[in-house]
């Protein structure tokens, strides 16, 4: 399958979101246990039609969202995106499939997307929110240079400048 590569890191190709990966997207977002770490708790599956609309909307908007594909195998790793972006700041979001976790892809992806955001998109500030009990993600974000700047019972807010 032909996917347009936007940028790369050592082990990851960052490609445009595409309907070719729809099955992988659905598997990832409907893994209720895994998705609880980055979207929150829910019990219903996301239907295929809704996910197709999401992909098409992101493509039409030319949104800065990328699917991550393993260079060596071509397997889907997850998605990473900038949300609520203005000319100098954006919120970072990342989702990695359960089977590709604990393999170093999170740190590599966060480092690469931060570099892309600052160098290619001209961002001066990148921020994110993470659940306080998601210690693996917090550790990765800290390793990539993010620092906590606020906290509530539900979220920790981190940024890199």
Predicted regions located by residue number:
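Amphipathic alpha-helical recognition patches that constitute DNA-binding helices
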Residues: 24, 91, 95, 136
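Conserved acetyl-CoA-binding loop-helix of GNAT-fold acetyltransferases
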Residues: 96, 102-117, 138-143
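Conserved G/P- and acidic residue-centered "switch" motifs that form tight phosphate/ATP-binding loops
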Residues: 74, 104, 134
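Acetyl-CoA-dependent GNAT
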Residues: 41-93, 97-99, 152
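Conserved functional loop/turn residues at catalytic and ligand-binding sites
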Residues: 21, 33, 100, 104, ...
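Short alpha-helical
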Residues: 20, 87, 135-136
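C-terminal "cap" of GNAT-fold acetyltransferases
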Residues: 124-138, 143-161
């Amino acid at each position: 399958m032909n996917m347009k590569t936007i940028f790369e890191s050592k082990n990851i190709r960052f490609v445009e979101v595409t309907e070719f990966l729809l099955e992988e997207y659905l598997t990832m977002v409907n893994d209720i246990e895994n998705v609880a770490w980055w979207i929150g708790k829910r019990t219903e599956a996301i239907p295929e039609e809704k996910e197709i609309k999401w992909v098409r909307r992101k493509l039409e908007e030319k949104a800065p969202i990328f699917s991550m594909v393993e260079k060596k195998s071509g397997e889907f790793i997850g998605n990473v995106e900038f949300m609520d972006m203005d000319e100098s700041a954006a919120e970072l979001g990342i989702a990695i499939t359960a089977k590709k976790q604990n393999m170093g892809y999170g740190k590599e992806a966060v480092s690469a997307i931060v570099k892309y955001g600052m160098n290619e998109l001209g961002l001066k500030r990148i921020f994110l929110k993470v659940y306080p009990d998601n210690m693996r993600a917090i550790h990765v974000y800290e390793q990539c240079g993010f620092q906590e700047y606020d906290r509530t019972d539900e979220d920790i807010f981190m940024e890199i400048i």
